[in-house]
Amino acid sequence: MRFFHSIIVLLFSISTGSAFLLYGCNLSENLCDNDESCYPDGVFGQCYSSESGSPEPTVLDNLDDTQLELLKLELTRLAAKDKDWGDEETQCVLAYFKMSMFYQLQYDPDFCQVRKPANVWALIQLIDTGLTEDPTILDEDVNPENVTDEDMAQIIEQLKEPSLPTEEDIEEALNAQNEDVDDEILDQYVQAVVNNENPDFSELSDGQLNILIGRLVDLKKNVENEEAQLLTGDGEQEMAVPLDDLEERGEQAILKKDIEQVGEINQGLDNTEHKIVKGRKDQVVTRVDANRVYLKVHLKNEDQLMPLIEFLQNTIAIPNNLYFDDFQFENGQLSMRISRFEGAKPKADKRIDSVEGVASAVYKRRKDIARLSGADVRETGIGSGEDGSLPVESSERDWLLMPVLFVCAFTVTALGLVAAVQIARSRRHYKDNIQQIAEQLDGKNSFAYQDLCRQRADGGRASKSSSTSSWCEETAVPTIDISTGHVVLNFLQEYLSEPTKIEAQWNGIKDYRNEERTKTKAEKFASQNRTILPFDDNIVDIDGKTAENEDFYLNASFIYDDDPRQAVYIAAQTPASSQIAAFWQTIWQHGVCLVVNLSTPEECKQEKNYWPDTGSEVHGAFEIHLVSEHIWSDDYLVRSFYLKNLQNSQTRTITQFHYLSWQKESTPTSAKSILEFRRKVNKSYRGRSSAVLVHSWDGSGRTGVYCAVDVLCARLLRGIRQIDVVATVEHLRDQRDGMVATGDQFKLVYGCVAQEVNHLLKSIATK
């Protein structure tokens, strides 16, 4: 009792106006608000603002293999439901997992499997925030129930996907289909017997007759037991019925899962009377017939009762294996007894398994009842409609809906208007003072602020779930000045307006190749190469075995910009079927988080895809699981994978950006789509020390164009004062042959860089 009292105190001590912090911002860039940052919480990051006044989020350290496996299974189940990071159920699961692991609570896989997971998520966040603000709220003598290894293994088993059906399961399913047909026939005979009719039993087989007799005997016993309980009830205490006894009598406990969690819950279908007793024994005792449902109806004449009863039998009772009998009608109130036969299977997809559900179902069908029988249902509930009844649905409550909606709409509109006025005032004030602020700053504090941001990024805290932990986004305000930008733009536009200049440059470098470098390692595996062979001194080495074993060879080269110690790209050919394991080994070994795929779907079909279309696949020592696939435009899509090392059970997240419409040795119809694609890549999760793996069918032409455009645009952001496309292409070809393969691709580099300079100048003018 002291623990629950502490929880109540905790909930009332938390500010109701605090915003809920979203989880998963390391993997989804759009989760956090503008004033929030992604706080490294040891899982997938949590949105947090230091100005909100909320305490810093808790941090999970050193999750063991079992906890990581549990988290993976939860995420797999969410991915199977097409839940994204912003979904309420996803946020509920992440919040509950984090709180359970941090406070060592018993974990329940179905905790968030409710109709409105947002409510559970809100409760978890309130409790977690309160415990963080004041850990002394909980009583010292309340010991949390630690999760044992057996409990965790049992939870993981609940989350695992079901295995494929065996032959016995298939045969049992086929027999069950035949039994459904018999059940429908036998239900009609049982209904006829209950209604005192004389059905013709000659059409039934011997087996069906035996089943029918058994059902009637069981039904008779149930009715007798119910009557005996009513007669022997002492009005003071209800005897508990053990669950084992229910199973021996062929009865079934409803929602057994809930019974195991919170004790025995009577769903109202057993023929029992619940006595609500308050005060002394000599006070009034109110009884509720928990196996009866009543309807308050308005009838023009009692002839309308029969169509009403027939409608209830056909639409509610029969589809759910329920029996409605003992109908009583008095003073505009119709009541009936609800019972259920446990031996048959329900015919409805969503089974009604409580008297409350029956009452709600009747009220929902009140319009159909009025149309077919003329009866007007005004209220439904549990009981016989007398003083001890419990209303479930009533038309008297419906009139409140429109006023409540009106008040809500008015409130939202008023808040929106207030916010709009405040924003307009803030912008007007900002415009009036922007010039004065700019003169005071004179550009000095801007550089100091940028330097501070770089220092904080370099000293950032590492993530627990990956070896890389930074966000690489292009600088919001580029360091290039407007005058330099216009000079560069005029230079590029001059070349684009005179194609002969670009053609002359291309003729000078189209046959350029570095003859001083050797390719002996790649020549050993000639069958694994398409057209381009990587150089020996910058070939991507896998576990130091590239030159020894064909299984550890991948046609890929490290590409450097101005820092020879750190590769910016890994340029590779699209892996053949025999190179898929080496491809994923390369990604794992060199900490790659981003993969840029420039091969068309037609080219990918020539070899087996290195990623699964659905579910997961195992290649070598790695298991690859497809988490999501989003189509961002007609030209490209984005896939997200979980990569698991089967040797040490570590996992990482890999994002693939697939450009679909760029044919080999050609150019896209628009440079704009290439630039949008590049910006999307550069705004995604990338480690400070990890290269971007860029591949096309042969790993040369299209790969070279993408690397050249990205290198030149990145230099512009760093504030260089001149652009040399020819020197950039030669620099790339010094590291891998064939980078930028045709004159049209060379011209595309000019066009992309010119559009990017124009975009930067517009952004500078806007800001």
Curated annotation (Swiss-Prot):
- The record lists the membrane-crossing segments as 399-419
Task: Give me the glycosylation sites of this protein.
Answer: 26, 146
Tissue specificity, in the record's words, reads:
In hermaphrodites specifically expressed in neurons and in particular in the head nerve ring (ADE, ALA, ASI, ASK, AUA, ASG, AVH and AVJ neurons), in the ventral nerve cord, pre-anal ganglia (PVP neuron), in the tail (PHA, PHB and PHC neurons) and in vulval motor neurons VC and HSN and the vulval uv1 cells. In males, also expressed in neurons anterior to the nerve ring and male-specific neurons in the tail.
> Which keywords has UniProt assigned to this entry?
Cell projection, Cleavage on pair of basic residues, Cytoplasmic vesicle, Glycoprotein, Membrane, Signal, Transmembrane, Transmembrane helix, Transport
One MF annotation (Gene Ontology) recorded for this entry: transmembrane receptor protein tyrosine phosphatase activity
Null mutant phenotype reads: Viable and fertile with a reduced brood size. Locomotion is slightly slower and the expulsion step of the defecation cycle is often missing. In males, impaired mating turning behavior characterized by abnormal repetitive turning during the first turn. 50 percent reduction in dense-core vesicles in ventral cord neurons. Paralysis induced by acetylcholinesterase inhibitor aldicarb is reduced in 50 percent of mutants. Resistant to aldicarb-induced reduction in brood size. In a unc-64 (e246) mutant background increases dauer formation whereas in a unc-31 (e169) abolishes dauer formation.
PTM statement from Swiss-Prot or TrEMBL:
Proteolytically cleaved probably at a dibasic consensus sequence by egl-3.
Q: Give residue spans on the Cytoplasmic membrane side.
A: 420-767
Q: Which residues lie on this side of the membrane: Lumenal?
A: 20-398
Q: Which SUPFAM superfamilies match?
A: (Phosphotyrosine protein) phosphatases II (SSF52799)
Record's subcellular location: Cytoplasmic vesicle membrane; Perikaryon; Cell projection, Axon; Cell projection, Dendrite
Q: How is it placed in the membrane, per its record? A: Single-pass type I membrane protein
Q: Which InterPro entries match?
A: IA-2/IA-2_beta (IPR033522), Prot-tyrosine_phosphatase-like (IPR029021), PTP_cat (IPR000242), Tyr_Pase_cat (IPR003595), Tyr_Pase_dom (IPR000387)
Q: Which residues form the signal peptide?
A: 1-19
Q: Where is each Tyrosine-protein phosphatase domain found?
A: 527-756
Q: Name one GO cellular component term.
A: cytoplasmic vesicle membrane
Q: Name one GO biological process term.
A: positive regulation of neurotransmitter secretion
State the family it belongs to: Belongs to the protein-tyrosine phosphatase family. Receptor class 8 subfamily.
The record's section on PANTHER family has:
IA-2 PROTEIN TYROSINE PHOSPHATASE, ISOFORM C (PTHR46106:SF4)
Function, as annotated: Regulates dense-core vesicle (DCV) trafficking and/or secretion. Probably by controlling DCV trafficking, plays a role in the AVG neuron-mediated formation of the right axon tract of the ventral nerve cord. Involved in locomotion by regulating acetylcholine release. Probably by controlling the secretion of FLP neuropeptides, regulates the turning step of male mating behavior. Plays a role in preventing dauer formation.
Protein name listed in UniProt: Receptor-type tyrosine-protein phosphatase-like ida-1
For this protein's source organism, the top of the classification is:
Eukaryota, Metazoa, Ecdysozoa, Nematoda, Chromadorea
